[in-house]
Amino acid sequence: SYAFDYSRDRKTPNIKVSQTAKEVILTNGLGAKAVIQKTPFSIKMLSETGEIIVQDDPKRPVMFDQATGEIQTTKLRKSEVETYYGFGEKAFMEMSRNGKYIVNWNTDTFAYPIGTDPIYQSIPFFYALHNGKTYGLFFNNTFRTYFDMGKTSPERYTFGADGGELDYFVFTGGKDRSPKKVLEDYANLTGKTPLPPMWALGNQQSRWSYFPESRVREIAAGFRKNKIPADVIYLDIDYMDEYRVFTWDKKRFPDPSKMISDLKADGFK
């Protein structure tokens, strides 16, 4: 998968498989279970203490459109007070994602109003919180994905994609069902952010473009003159030759190498 951190050494999970006439049960080493009902097909996930965490809606567990390749699954909500958080940067007023229809498809949306979706990030991962207990769900799919978090029906939530596989991971949160454990397990699967260099933690001056070169130098000099800490200055798109990437507008920036060298000597990236 594109999303996994393959640099980690992983142990083969210790999974016990049991079966009855009606279902197949997969149990991990900590006691969490995936219970697969054979007919009609449905899946439910149980915590280490036996509590149902995620459960298919038996009327609509999985949908696959052979003509378009679209896939989706629908889960029952424990109640309307089960609250959802996550999905990365979104243009909603509320932290809660309850009642939202969320699309993951990176989009460069300029000057977007509140409620616009999709925008810049696609993170198909969320937390669910109910009675102080948490679980997490990550949908491992690179196609355009969507999450209906109770918008269509408050009794259920649905997620799917325009194609690909219905490949998702449920994080139980351990015996304590804690958000910390959910995040640890998600990060162990997908990777952790490397420790950034010291300069990246400093003040970074950014806006929609500083140009020409004289203006950039003026900004840098102003920070130093006024003793305002700053480590980075962003140029944005107006340094380019007619907005073509990997080019410089030689009228606005006649000697970019010299400018960058001088800024570096003055402590700017």
Q: Which sequence ranges carry the predicted segments?
A:
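Acidic/aromatic-lined carbohydrate-recognition and catalytic surfaces
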Residues: 234-269
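A short, structure-level motif marking secondary-structure boundaries and short turns
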Residues: 203-206, 243-245
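Short, well-ordered coil/turn segments that N-cap beta-strands
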Residues: 197-201, 228-231, 266-269
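N-terminal accessory segment at the very beginning of proteins
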Residues: 1-190, 196-199, 206-208, 215, ...
